Regions:
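Sec-dependent bacterial lipoprotein signal peptides
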Residues: 1-16
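Exported/periplasmic ABC-transporter solute-binding proteins
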Residues: 18-47, 62, 66-69, 81-82, ...
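Short, high-confidence coil segments that cap the C-terminus of an alpha-helix
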Residues: 51, 73-74, 175
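A structural micro-motif
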Residues: 52-54, 95, 128, 192
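Periplasmic-binding protein-like
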Residues: 75-79
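Central helical "cap/lid" subdomain
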Residues: 92, 96-98
Length: 243
């Protein structure tokens, strides 16, 4: 199973350990929806830059911004929305970001689709156990924007800390449906059924990336790689759009 979950304990230990890394290790804090694409990008970057290692911390963008603003030793921040990135910008923790990808929402349901969901409007049924990201997280903010845009009165069964937590609940049949990013469906092919949302009623998130104000020198090279041809090719292979 390609689905990767990162516990808060693991993330805390990771960030604490980064303080002792040498200059050849770049710490990248990235939105959980970037897990698969960035893992592949990191491997490609390391292959092209012998001697440089990439260490990832994947979590909800809002939590990552809080960690960075609190002084966590991070070199690169890639968020799932401009709003989450702006929190780090406003605190002076990061340099000016640039957009590197776009993403939109989809509905994930168990393979057997027990609630017989076929459309966005089906999620308004009180009998449907729906899980979404908490609103401070970009996937949550986007979900509530989606509901408002389509005049849907939604009462989720639970609010999750990041999009991969939402996806996990669907994978293990603890929910009838979850609002995730389209790209997340590529990580669980054969484990969930994806229901696409029409573009005209969907919500598109723009993903920004930047280095922190005290980033290691090679951090800029990683950002250039992500925004360059190789990085963009990998992102598109996972379903991300160009900015």
């Amino acid at each position: 199973m390609r689905l990767l979950t990162v516990s808060l304990i693991a993330a805390s230990l990771l960030l604490a350990g980064c303080a002792n890394d040498d200059a050849s290790t770049i710490t990248v804090s990235a939105a959980s929806s970037l897990t698969d694409a960035f893992t592949e990008i990191g491997a490609a970057f390391e292959e092209q830059n012998p001697g440089t290692s990439i260490r990832f911390n994947f979590a909800g963008s809002s939590r990552l911004a809080e960690q960075i603003n609190s002084g966590a030793p991070v070199d690169v921040f890639a968020a799932a929305s401009t709003a989450a990135m702006q929190r780090a910008v406003d605190s002076g923790s990061v340099e000016t970001p640039r957009a590197f990808a776009t993403n939109s929402l989809a509905i994930a349901v168990p393979l057997q689709n027990p609630a017989d969901i076929s459309d966005l409007t089906d999620l308004a049924d009180p009998a449907v156990t729906l899980v979404v990201c908490d609103s401070p997280v970009p996937c949550g903010a986007a979900a509530w924007e989606l509901f408002a845009k389509n005049n849907l009165a939604i009462k989720p069964a639970s609010l999750e800390p990041d999009v991969r937590a939402v996806l996990t609940k669907v994978v293990v049949d603890e929910a009838d449906a979850g609002i995730v990013y389209r790209t997340d469906l590529n990580a669980v092919v054969g484990e969930v059924k994806g229901i696409q949302i029409r573009d005209e009623v969907n919500v598109i998130n723009e993903y920004p990336i930047t280095v922190t104000t005290d980033a290691k020198p090679d951090a800029r090279s990683f950002v250039e790689f992500v925004t360059g041809n190789d990085g963009q090719r990998i992102l598109q292979s996972w379903g991300f759009g160009r900015p």
